[in-house]
UniProtKB/Swiss-Prot annotation:
The gene is PAP14. Glycans are attached at residues 79, 246, 266, 371, 384. One of its GO terms (molecular function) is acid phosphatase activity. Keywords: Glycoprotein, Iron, Metal-binding, Secreted, Signal, Zinc. Specifically expressed in flowers. One of its GO terms (cellular component) is plasmodesma. This is Probable inactive purple acid phosphatase 14. Its cofactor is Fe cation; Zn(2+).
Length: 401
C-alpha cells in the first residue's frame, strides 16, 4: 500500500512537471529551442563572472596602458587573455558576462571580428555559457552594433541575443537587449521556474540628439517598456501553478554605461570598493532607475565604463556596482591591478530538504595580481532582510573616456 502511494506521488509530480513544461514553451520563441538552459547547480549555487572594458585590440601586438615601466615592454592584450583564463579556472563560473567595451574599434583594429574572437576566446575555450553587451567603443569600426551582436550571437557557447523576439512590439532601441532566466536545479520543485532573472541592456554609445554635443547615450523609453513587460510576465509565471511562489524572483541588470544614480556616491559614503574617478553617465536621466525601484524586483545593477571605480553601494534597495577594468589596453592606474567582479546566488532549503528560492546574493572581486587576490566579499541581498540605504553625491570633473 505504501509503495503504491509512493509511486502515485512520483507519477503525479512528473505529470505536473510535464504539463508545466508544455505550458511554458508557449512563451518560448523558436530562437530559444536548442540553446542551453541556465539553471542552478545541485549545490544550490549559481555564479556569474562579469568582465568589463577589455578594450581588446590586436593581441600580442597591442601595447598596454597604465602599467609600470618594468611591465610595459612585455605587456599586451595577451595579459588580458591570461587574466581571464586564470580567473575562469579559479572561479569556475556558471555564466560569463562581458559588459561592454570588449574591443576597441576606434582606429585600433582593422579586423574587428578577429579582435572579438581573441577577446572572447577564454570563454569559448572554457565551454562555459557566456553573453555580451556592447559599450561605447565596441562599434567604432566598420561594423555596426547590430552586425556585432549578430556575430557575437553565433559564436560557440554564446547565449547572447541581438534583441528579444518581441522587440518589434516595442520598437526597441539598440541592439543587445535580452533576458536570461536561471531555473531551479535538478530535483528541485522549481526545476521549471525561473528563480533568478538577468536583464542585459544596450545603453548605447553617444547621443545623436541636437543640443547635447558629444555625450553618452541612455536607456530609452522603449527599452524600459520592454523591461517592465518582461518583468511582469516573469512575476506572473513565478506565482502561477504549479508550485506557485509568494514573492517575486530577484533580478540583476547588466549595462555598460552607468546610470546617473551611480554619481550619488562619493568617498565619504558607505560603499564597498573605491571611487577613483567621476561617474561618466548620460546627461539625461531617463528614469530607468525609478522604473527598477517601482518594480521592486532588481537587486543589483552592474556596469563598467569607469575603469578605476570598483565600488558597490546601495540606493533604495538596489545595489549599484562597478566591475572595474579588466583589460590591459584600456586605461587604468599604475599599481592598481586589473579586476573582474563575481556574483553568486545561493538557494534556500525548503522544509522538505529540497532547494527552494534564492536566499542570498553576494559579490566579490578577483584581481590580476601575484596572488590572484579575492577582495571585498559583500552581501548584496538576502531574502529575509532589507539592507539600510546609502546616499551620497559627487560632482567632480568628468575625465575623458
Amino acid at each position: 500500500m505504501e509503495e503504491t502511494r509512493r509511486r502515485f506521488v512520483i507519477s503525479s509530480v512528473l505529470s505536473v512537471s510535464l504539463i508545466y513544461l508544455c505550458l511554458s514553451t508557449c512563451h518560448v520563441s523558436a530562437f530559444d529551442f536548442g540553446r542551453r538552459q541556465l539553471r542552478f547547480n545541485t549545490d544550490g549555487r549559481f555564479k556569474i563572472l562579469q568582465v568589463s572594458d577589455m578594450h581588446y585590440g590586436f593581441g600580442k601586438e597591442t601595447q598596454c596602458s597604465d602599467v609600470s615601466p618594468a611591465e610595459f615592454p612585455y605587456c599586451s592584450d595577451l595579459n588580458t587573455t591570461s587574466f581571464l583564463q586564470r580567473t575562469i579556472a579559479s572561479e569556475k563560473p556558471d555564466l560569463i558576462v562581458f559588459s561592454g567595451d570588449n574591443v576597441y574599434g576606434l582606429c585600433e583594429t582593422s579586423d574587428v571580428a578577429k579582435s572579438m574572437d581573441m577577446a572572447f576566446a577564454p570563454a569559448i575555450e572554457s565551454g562555459i555559457p557566456w553573453v555580451a553587451i556592447l559599450g561605447n567603443h565596441d562599434q567604432e569600426s566598420d561594423m555596426t552594433r547590430e552586425t556585432m551582436m549578430k556575430y557575437i550571437m553565433k559564436l560557440p557557447n554564446s547565449l547572447s541575443q541581438v534583441n528579444p523576439p518581441d522587440a518589434w512590439l516595442y520598437q526597441i532601441d539598440g541592439f543587445g537587449n535580452y533576458n536570461l532566466q536561471i531555473e531551479g536545479p535538478f530535483g528541485s520543485p522549481l526545476f521549471f521556474k525561473s528563480i533568478l532573472n538577468l536583464y542585459l541592456l544596450d545603453g548605447g554609445s553617444y547621443t545623436k540628439l541636437d543640443g547635447f554635443g558629444y555625450k553618452y547615450d541612455w536607456v530609452k523609453t522603449s527599452q524600459q517598456n520592454w523591461y517592465e513587460h518582461t518583468s511582469k510576465w516573469l512575476e506572473m509565471e513565478h506565482k502561477r501553478w504549479p508550485f506557485p511562489q509568494n514573492s517575486t524572483a530577484p533580478g540583476l541588470v547588466y549595462l555598460h554605461i552607468p546610470m546617473p544614480e551611480f554619481a550619488l556616491f562619493n568617498k565619504s559614503t558607505e560603499m564597498t570598493g573605491v571611487r577613483q574617478e567621476s561617474t561618466c553617465s548620460p546627461p539625461i536621466n531617463s528614469g530607468f532607475f525609478t522604473k527598477l525601484v517601482e518594480r521592486g524586483e532588481v537587486k543589483g545593477v552592474f556596469s563598467g565604463h569607469d575603469h578605476v571605480n570598483d565600488f558597490c553601494a546601495e540606493l533604495h534597495g538596489i545595489n549599484l556596482c562597478y566591475a572595474g577594468g579588466a583589460g590591459y589596453h584600456g586605461y587604468g592606474q599604475v599599481g592598481w591591478a586589473r579586476r573582474v567582479r563575481v556574483v553568486e546566488a545561493q538557494l534556500e532549503k525548503t522544509m522538505y530538504g529540497r532547494w527552494g528560492a534564492v536566499d542570498t546574493i553576494k559579490t566579490w572581486k578577483r584581481l590580476d595580481d601575484k596572488n590572484h587576490s579575492l577582495i571585498d566579499t559583500q552581501l548584496l541581498w538576502t531574502k529575509n532582510t532589507t539592507l539600510e540605504p546609502n546616499f551620497g553625491f559627487s560632482c567632480s570633473t568628468i575625465p575623458q573616456h
